[in-house]
Amino acid sequence: VYIMSGKQNHQYHLVEPSPWPAVGSASGFTLVLGAAMYMHEYPYSAFILIAGFLMLFATMFFWWRDVVREAEYQGHHSPIVQIGMRYGMMLFIASEVMFFVAFFWAFFDASLYPDTGVWPPEDVQVFDPFDLPLINTMILLLSGCTVTWSHHALQHDNRKDFLLGLFLTILLGISFTALQAYEYSHAAFGFTDGIYASTFYMATGFHGAHVIIGTIFLIVCLIRGCVGHFKAEKHLG
């Protein structure tokens, strides 16, 4: 609500009309369509898949640009708006939990009551859990430590350790992705080689995608931190 002087008498951010939700939806549709066509070996499917990726990255870039401008330069992220962002993140994490519960449900449904009477299937050569999977697990745990260190450093206005922690976390995220790509390239089974392979690639693949997206988020935060964004008392948005 606005008073006659044109000044707003509330702390809510009335967002200006934006094309990015619609463009993002179109990007996601193009990406999924291209991926499905690529898996079924349709002609020109690779171009559609690449176009979907490019559209999605462009949407992320321009949408983040708008959010940064609203937070850093226009001052729209009031305490009330920040509370809304926190609630939004909580709901997002809850939806992510349900997302991965579905994959674990599929895995345990197949593993606890296997049709062949044995799990994993006898013809599947599985990974040694104490080899690369253990290394990647340790990398993830270490990345959680470094990003927490970075956050606490920022809260104490220690920008050097804040940026160093972010940089190390990004390196760990890239290392995890590289090792998972190496693991996939040396796997003895493909995505269509039965229920074990399907649930393995579905769960670990989406998890890897989350690591990649999170690494991109942290790279953006590192760039913003290098140009002076984020303060000890205000670093949300």
Question: Residue ranges of each PLM-predicted region?
Answer:
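...captures the hydrophobic TM-helix bundle architecture rather than a specific catalytic motif
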Residues: 1-237
